[in-house]
Amino acid sequence: FGTEVRDAETVLAALRFTDATDIVGIPAGSGAANTGVLAFADYDGDGDRDLFVGGRLLQNEITGFVDVTQVAGLASGQPSAALFGDYDNDGFLDLYVAADGEGRLYRNARDGSFSDVTSSLGLSVPAGAPLFLDFDQDGDLDLSVSGASGGFLLRNNLDGSFTDVTSRAGIGNAGAGGSMAFGDFDDDDDIDFVVSADGRQARVYDNERLGRFAARPEGLGSYAAGTGISSVGDYNNDGFLDVLVAPRGGRAVELYLNESGTTFGADDRPTALLASARDFDVHDAAFIDFDNDGWLDVLLVGESGDEGVIRLFRNAAAGQFDDVSDLLPDVPPLRRIATGDFGDDGDLDIFVSTADGAARLLRNDGGNANRYLKMQLVGLSTGSGKNNHFGLGAKLEVRAGGLYQTRVVTGPDIHIGLGQHARADVVRVRWPNGVPQNLFYPGANQSVVEEQILKGSCPFLYTWDGEAFTFVTDLMWKSALGMP
């Protein structure tokens, strides 16, 4: 698909990332080794984004960030992972923390504090990389954890309790020590996994419904030492979610194109990006549209010896990625990435965590030369209740002139680059339950809260077989925007 954007050289010439850590008042690190845990979200509902980094909860106040860990009721420790997610569907973000060999689930009390509900819910939560998602499409967020002994899947029972369904789901042997990401890779309106693990290739697990997943036979990544990190995004704007694989041990990054939802093929065109990680260990990777041109770029962080490494590659929209890492400041060894519009100025800033439990803000100055649209979804708590509050797992399709792009909703905040378009022609939300909802002609450079509209059940198609009417299919309007 084509795109109409301001000349890239003009945008990039005026764009820089500035280390604004001291300016916004982020305190120094905890000093604990290897606590580069990072989560970024508005947990207190006051409209600005807060941080959980290195085991500390930092509340965003007018004068800077304040350490409220003890006041908020969070335990101290040596965390290895953390993630915000609204497991009880009340519109306030709860928190999972992996520390000291176990996982703890904290419920947001809506007053700035959290309560540890792990025991009261009867949870036996492993420590590992967490993922909140609604894999069974019943309207609440389940919890997946990639732990030291393999993958775990805990189903939310709609009443606040969880059931371990790992064995039935078939992901227990997915591998240990890596990470998980989700998306609807085959475009059949359910949530699939991609699992990265130590000692094996990354692998896609297709959702077969009824709580079961099946591993695709082909692996992603060519290294037996393991893939470590994977990231999901439609980087070629064809409507299907692709996968970036970042192996451990200073080996090349790999990109896999989703070929119409059926198979993944290695994309060897972006040579600069593919060779980029050979000289450092990648600890995290993310897709990010840093210049608002509607094409997903790639961000990598890690270390080489005692030196930090951060690399940024701009998607040139023609199968190539240009190395624009000179737009970034020097950094210490880094562990994790979180992106979002911290400055609320229309472009995506970058938070990174360091090995000693500190966070740094790399402020995007100039990415808003192109236009944008920010969205937040709100699922209905009435009616069928089949969509979680923030719409995690929904698919967004956006068309603006010749620019078409797809985004999978993985958190409350959705950022869409529009290039130089003054508006989008249409934004289609396909909610996690498969029901579509269209927003026509939203103007650029604004934030939109899109609430789910209660609709009747979808129409069904029956055919007469000579003796009786037989069911053919439901009509869920699954074609991409602008396509038959």
PLM features: residue spans?
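Gly/Ser/Thr/Pro-enriched helix-cap/hinge segments flanking short amphipathic alpha-helices
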Residues: 1, 266, 325-338, 344-484
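Blade-edge motifs of beta-propeller repeat domains
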Residues: 2-33, 59-77, 107-125, 155-175, ...
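Beta-strand-rich domains and repeat architectures in extracellular enzymes and scaffolds
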Residues: 24-53
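Beta-propeller blade termini
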Residues: 35-45, 80-89, 128-137, 177-187, ...
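Surface-exposed loop and edge beta-strand positions of immunoglobulin-like domains
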Residues: 41, 85, 98, 133, ...
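Hydrophobic beta-strand segments that make up the repeating blades of beta-propeller
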Residues: 48-54, 95-99, 143-147, 192-197, ...
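Short glycine/acidic-enriched loop and turn motifs that connect beta-strands
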Residues: 102, 150, 200, 249-251, ...
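Solenoidal tandem-repeat scaffolds enriched in leucines and small polar residues
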Residues: 125-154, 164-166, 172-203, 224-233, ...
